[in-house]
């Protein structure tokens, strides 16, 4: 009896790219739900606009490159890029901003390099940085959370604000940003940094309504908890490995604690660093991008530490309130060097001189 030996590979991984991307999309739901509860419908609408822009941009480039449309569009990578960008920008940013950022992310940062798996930089963060540099005022115009809003926009008001720059009653973004205390609101990180530079003490800032009874700003801490829960889901389902999120969070916590102990009157507290801004979103959904992150276990640890350090430095001494996007892109640049020096030893080969 003759036996036929099948060719390799001899194992089959049932997890396709589209399935992994779908699980990541599902994992973002707790964080998005917290955003919706505290900040309204804005970010959900931004995600929908970004998704349409991403699919159209990807389809257009694939058509120009004469690549198969259906197979590529079904891998869900464009939708994930759109979602990450949609939840990262202010909820009432004009529709054309998220469209510009998404189109730039898909065409320039992804397809220009050959598509999924070829891009050296995280596409969503490239799109975000383009928007931050080009439209700094709009990209720092966040609504106060529920409970601190002087005017709470409805779903119809949110749509009108995004597409027409005013609510149905004629309120502008500047009016919506003013909280119940009559003070224009910002993210906890931005609010804290601005207050410190204005001469207020950390104790005075922490006593303000934004931080009343919470560890990192009303609303924002629960948004981060939501993305943390989603990250645990990704770890449990083995969609990501633990090295990058753990080393990133540990690094950020270490440097934030060290800086705060040395200069408590001029630097943000460690808990605000950990549970404000895009910390947990970055730790589990952005920094863990398998295409642009390090590929070795030691390299992943170094990569996470580097992002944590850069995030703390930019947040503490830079001109932007949340430096995560810049930190991730700078770490992306270092990935080839990190991988080169952290490759495991190959036995049976003499080490080159």
UniProtKB/Swiss-Prot annotation:
The chain crosses the membrane at residues 20-40, 44-64, 77-108, 123-143, 214-234, 242-262, 267-287, 301-318. GO terms for cellular component: plasma membrane. It comes from the Bacteria. Its cofactor is FMN. The modification FMN phosphoryl threonine is found at residue 187. It is an enzyme of class 7 (translocase). GO terms for biological process: electron transport chain; transmembrane transport. Keywords: Cell inner membrane, Cell membrane, Electron transport, Flavoprotein, FMN, Membrane, Phosphoprotein, Translocase, Transmembrane, Transmembrane helix, Transport. It is a multi-pass membrane protein. InterPro entries: NqrB/RnfD (IPR004338), RnfD_bac (IPR011303). Its EC number is 7.-.-.-. It is found in: Cell inner membrane. Belongs to the NqrB/RnfD family. The complex is composed of six subunits: RnfA, RnfB, RnfC, RnfD, RnfE and RnfG. PANTHER family: ELECTRON TRANSPORT COMPLEX PROTEIN RNFD, ION-TRANSLOCATING OXIDOREDUCTASE COMPLEX SUBUNIT D. HAMAP family: RsxD_RnfD (MF_00462). This is Ion-translocating oxidoreductase complex subunit D. It comes from Erwinia tasmaniensis (strain DSM 17950 / CFBP 7177 / CIP 109463 / NCPPB 4357 / Et1/99).
């Amino acid at each position: 009896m003759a036996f036929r030996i099948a060719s390799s590979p001899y194992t089959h991984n049932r997890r396709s790219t589209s399935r992994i991307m779908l699980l990541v999309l599902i994992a973002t739901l707790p964080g998005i739900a917290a955003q919706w509860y505290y900040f309204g419908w804005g970010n959900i609408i931004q995600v929908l606009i970004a998704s349409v822009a991403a699919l159209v941009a990807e389809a257009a480039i694939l058509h120009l490159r004469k690549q198969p449309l259906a197979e590529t569009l079904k891998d869900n990578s464009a939708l994930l890029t759109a979602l990450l960008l949609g939840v990262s920008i202010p909820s009432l940013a004009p529709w054309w901003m998220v469209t510009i950022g998404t189109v730039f992310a898909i065409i320039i940062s992804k397809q220009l390099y050959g598509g999924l798996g070829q891009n050296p930089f995280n596409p969503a963060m490239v799109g975000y940085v383009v928007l931050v540099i080009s439209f700094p005022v709009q990209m720092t115009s966040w609504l106060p959370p529920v409970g601190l809003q002087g005017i709470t926009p409805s779903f119809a008001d949110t749509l009108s604000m995004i597409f027409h720059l005013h609510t149905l009653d004629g309120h502008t973004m500047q009016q919506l940003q003013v909280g119940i205390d009559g003070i224009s609101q910002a993210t906890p990180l931005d609010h804290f940094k601005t207050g410190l530079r204005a001469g207020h003490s950390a104790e005075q800032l922490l006593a303000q309504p934004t931080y009343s009874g919470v560890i990192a700003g009303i609303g924002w801490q629960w948004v981060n908890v939501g993305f943390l829960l989603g990250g645990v889901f990704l770890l449990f389902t083995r969609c990501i490995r633990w090295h990058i999120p753990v080393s990133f969070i540990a690094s950020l916590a270490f440097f934030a604690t060290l800086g705060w102990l040395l200069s408590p009157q001029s630097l943000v507290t460690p808990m605000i660093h950990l549970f404000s801004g895009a910390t947990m979103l970055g730790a589990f959904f952005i920094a863990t991008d398998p295409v642009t992150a390090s590929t070795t276990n030691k390299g992943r640890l170094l990569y996470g530490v580097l992002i944590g350090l850069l995030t703390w430095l930019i947040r503490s001494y830079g001109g932007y309130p949340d430096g995560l996007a810049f930190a991730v892109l700078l770490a992306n640049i270092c990935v080839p060097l990190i991988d080169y020096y952290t490759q495991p030893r190959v036995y049976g080969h003499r080490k080159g001189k």
